[in-house]
Amino acid sequence: MTKVAVEKEEPGVVYKVAGSLVIAENMSGTRMYELAKVGWNKLVGEIIRLEGNYAYIQVYEDTSGLSVGDPVIKTGNALSVELGPGILDNIYDGIQRPLERIANVCGDVYIYKGIDMTSLDHDKQWQFYADKKLKLNDIVTGGDIFGFVDENKLFKEHKIMAPPNAKGRLTYIAPDGSYTLKDKIFELEYQGKKYTYGLSHLWPVRDPRPVLEKVTGDTLLLTGQRVLDSLFPTVQGGTCAIPGAFGCGKTCVSQALSKYSNSEVIIYVGCGERGNEMAEILSDFPELTTKVDNEDVGIMQRTCLVANTSNMPVAAREASIYTGITLCEYFRDMGYNATMMADSTSRWAEALREISGRLAEMPADSGYPAYLGARLASFYERAGKVKCIGSPSRIGSITIVGAVSPPGGDFSDPVTTATMSIVQAFWGLDKKLAQRKHFPSVNWSTSFSKYVRQLEQYFDNFDQDFLSLRQKISDILQQESDLNDIVQLVGKDSLSEDQKVVMEVAKIIREDFLQQNAFSDYDYMCPLQKTVGMMRIICHFYAQCLRTLQEYDSRERKIGWGSIYNTLRPTINKITHMKFENPKNSDEYFKKYFKALEEEITVGLRNLMEK
């Protein structure tokens, strides 16, 4: 027994170095996905294959300078993240190293090799409030809430939970007061042994945190983007994909979601994208505020960034996705609605392809590994609305929004096709729309959402006409795409009057409803009340125009779209200017505004008929 223990303590030795993959020998006694420290600099690595005495380690730092014979230390632990107060308003790399604190220590633009620093600040004092319902000798299981920490003005209740694998009889709980992450908060006794716990705990990133059961999502994820909220809505706890070529606005859509969605926590993972995009978030987010108790509070206080840009080690891209989703699961277990932005899953798949190539695995389509679909599915499967373990009972959700960057905007790319088969909402971005400066460039013909039926009750409670208005707008856009072929062949003049109305109303929908300027004061986001009001006005105008044309046909007095346009030009201008209404206006204001405009359309067309 002693001999085995000594052998386990004996370090392994580097046998071969191939880019980010290191093969080490003398590694008996290790497990899959165990953390290893490679070389004299103690670079962080993870064991991804075991063959006899050899371990294949993917290293999350630059391996230049490693040589055969360097030591490899076995840690006995899996790659884990530290979960506790201080995660929000922070920026990490792919393996949860705090970049801001590292920059202060290094004083350089580059991270030093093998730097070892706690993910959370262990010296910062947090004000802890214990749960008064808990008594000594109570039986405690994983997920039970012991109290909460006042984290910041926007995220006031950071709940302190027992780790999912903890259980026992409560023998100590700290009174209200200021504590650091090093201090003992509660103590459990199980089978004669005592276990102490603090404000934070570790959890392996590859293991999904346990839940009681999954429940059906039935609440709309408000994005503030009209095209998404109206035509392709998604639920809190849903899975969405945003595929698109370069320059289509994927990052802009995911940033808009981070800024204005109705989630309580945002985890933004920049996985292999440009560093400037993360820098843009770091410069934009601190300026964005939201009102809390009549006080402006920075939106960064509900956001955590996991930055793994394209010039960082490729292997860490894979880890960054798992790090992000584990942070999300932690907030979900508190009973909050968390959203994870993965920008972009294509870069993650490319990292899988590179590591798979180094392992000499058989390549499948486009060189990606055969298990690409399974890995994507296991990642997206961690989304959902759930009943959390522990007491008191609570419901939380994780929404995953994954950007996909297919080369050349080709949606038949393996990553895009695998993602399409998994996700329930598909917001396909179109290069042609982007070139016409139509943003967000969501193609209404190729995109879809399977959540509409789940959201029926929600929309009925909000506005009974919503689903019929949504269907009507989809029909008008579909009719326009069918008529476009005729127009290109024989011109607009050959169309009948009602077809001309379809074309003109579809133009209003495209240019004045679906288009949205993310950088303007009036259209950076759109509340649902304004979206529904705009849909109602457009559909009402369309229905009234068709009714007027039909009545004139029966009276044998010809009237065309030209007459309607000339008579109602001021009203049509008002319809096209609806989006300029300030989104900060109250719901009551929007109801009055749209009611007056609806009346104006009805009266205008009635006067035209009476002439």
UniProtKB/Swiss-Prot annotation:
Gene3D superfamilies membership: 2.40.30.20, 2.40.50.100, Bovine Mitochondrial F1-atpase, Atp Synthase Beta Chain, Chain D, domain 3 (1.10.1140.10), P-loop containing nucleotide triphosphate hydrolases (3.40.50.300)
Technological use: Possible candidate for an effective malaria vaccine as determined by epitope response in sera.
Pfam families the record matches: ATP-synt_ab, ATP-synt_ab_N, ATP-synt_ab_Xtn, ATP-synt_VA_C
Enzyme type, top EC level: translocase
Positions contributing to ATP binding: G244, A245, F246, G247, C248, G249, K250, T251
Localization of this protein: Cell membrane; Vacuole; Vesicle
SUPFAM superfamilies: C-terminal domain of alpha and beta subunits of F1 ATP synthase, N-terminal domain of alpha and beta subunits of F1 ATP synthase, P-loop containing nucleoside triphosphate hydrolases
Known role: Catalytic subunit of the V1 complex of vacuolar(H+)-ATPase (V-ATPase), a multisubunit enzyme composed of a peripheral complex (V1) that hydrolyzes ATP and a membrane integral complex (V0) that translocates protons. V-ATPase is responsible for acidifying and maintaining the pH of intracellular compartments and in some cell types, is targeted to the plasma membrane, where it is responsible for acidifying the extracellular environment. During the trophozoite stage, involved in the acidification of the extracellular space next to the cell membrane.
Protein name per UniProt: V-type proton ATPase catalytic subunit A
Gene it is expressed from: vapA
